Amino acid sequence: VYMELGRNNLAQADYSLVLDLEKNNEEALLMRAYIYMQQREYKMAKADYERLLKVNPASYNGRLGLATLEQKEGKYEEALGVLNNMIATTGETSQLSSSQYAMLYVARAGVEKDLNHMDMALVDLEEAIRLDSSQPEIYLMRGEIYLAQKKKDLAKRDFEKAVSLGVPQADLRDLLQQTRK
């Protein structure tokens, strides 16, 4: 409830209390790590993600969170390592929904985009669309890449698709204007 109200400090205190009582509570570890990431307290976030992964090494959210943390810290190779491992092991076992699997490709595309490997990012985004075409994040990222590549018609199409999937058009006003210039 506190997080929904923007009171992360109170939510963090509650999760810490839960962890005092239950050291290995996966949800509390995950949510506190998330709060730490929002506060840019990356060392604390990493400690919680690593603790979570000791409790449950297969935790999708824990591993994805750790990869996101590595990316935010500019540790792109580490982030790619986590994501590549998740994609490889998921492909073998397919324990995830197609939506969760697609989000792994979106996450990896984000790291590739940060590394300026736009073609590799586009390949991952195509795979994400194949797995689950209902995720607006895919079209937003691909539209941004197309815009950077001066492929304005393709960018516009993707931004419009993101709007059709629920992204408020006002949020994309600047990006859509850039496709017209």
Regions found by a protein language model. Name each.
Residues 26-27, 60-61, 94-103, 136-137, ...:
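Helix-start (N-cap) detector for alpha-helical repeat units in TPR-like alpha-solenoids
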Residues 96-99, 144, 148-181:
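Terminal, low-structured helical/coil segments at or just beyond the last alpha-helical repeat
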Residues 3, 30-37, 71, 106, ...:
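Position-specific recognition of the canonical hydrophobic site in helix A of tetratricopeptide repeat
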Residues 22, 32, 52, 70, ...:
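Short, conserved structural micro-motifs that define repeat-unit consensus positions
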Residues 21, 55, 89-97, 131, ...:
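Structural marker of alpha-solenoid helical repeat scaffolds
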Residues 5-17, 39-51, 73-90, 115-127, ...:
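Structural signature of tandem alpha-helical TPR/SEL1-like repeats
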